[in-house]
Amino acid sequence: MFSPPSLLHITMTTEKIDNISVTTQANVYFDGKCVSHGITFADGTKKSVGVVLPSTLTFNTGAPEIMECVAGSCEYKLAGTDAWIKSAPGEKFSVPGNSSFDIRVGEAYHYICHFG
């Protein structure tokens, strides 16, 4: 069942993540327009931190994701919707599992992707 997008407003972006293991080899997608590194917490929780450079891209999801903007901004559109929604620093948006979303970036968009 499709859940409508949720936009969570918070007052502060995540600036630092402690006590993690970092995958040193970058994940490079879309000819370098998106670059990320995987991180793993002591409890096994996985996230990725990265940047999307100016472009319009489509990402597919396996697990549900929460995208947290830490710098820059983007507009996103979830699969099955027509509206572009802006996400700025300190904001998050949710993407269902086994779905996709379009992202439109005019300036470098720095993010944390929370899986599951």
Regions found by a protein language model. Give the residues of each.
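A short, N-terminal "cap"/entry segment at the start of jelly-roll beta-barrel domains
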Residues: 2-44
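Acidic, Ser/Thr/Pro
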Residues: 31, 36, 49-53, 60, ...
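Conserved short histidine dyad/triad with adjacent acidic residue
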Residues: 41-62, 94-97
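Short beta-strand segments in beta-sandwich/barrel cores
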Residues: 57, 72-77, 92
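Short alpha-helix capping/helix-loop boundary micro-motifs
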Residues: 60-62, 78-81
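Short, conserved beta-strand element in jelly-roll/cupin
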Residues: 62-75
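Short acidic-glycine-tyrosine-enriched beta hairpin
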Residues: 81-98
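Ligand-binding loop in jelly-roll beta-barrel domains
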Residues: 96-116
